[in-house]
């Protein structure tokens, strides 16, 4: 099953956040075609969740929670991102500050 190029999916995530008046930025740029995606979701500067696009058994992709959980300190989130970036040079990391993070996460996970 094919998927969108990483840079196209990242652009879509940025537009989706900005369309609702939220903040989104790329904090690590990976391979434009095949890079893995990691979203760091916060609300008013408070960390809420990390979401990663993963390959499923049927060959599709979906988003799942990973890394530090709700209200993790910024040092813990930065450490997690640093380890992931060293392990995966193709990684894209997107930081989002969302007014309604629970809704954003639910919509993202359900959309795959």
Task: Say what each PLM segment does.
Residues 1-112:
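Polybasic/polar functional segments that serve as interface/processing modules
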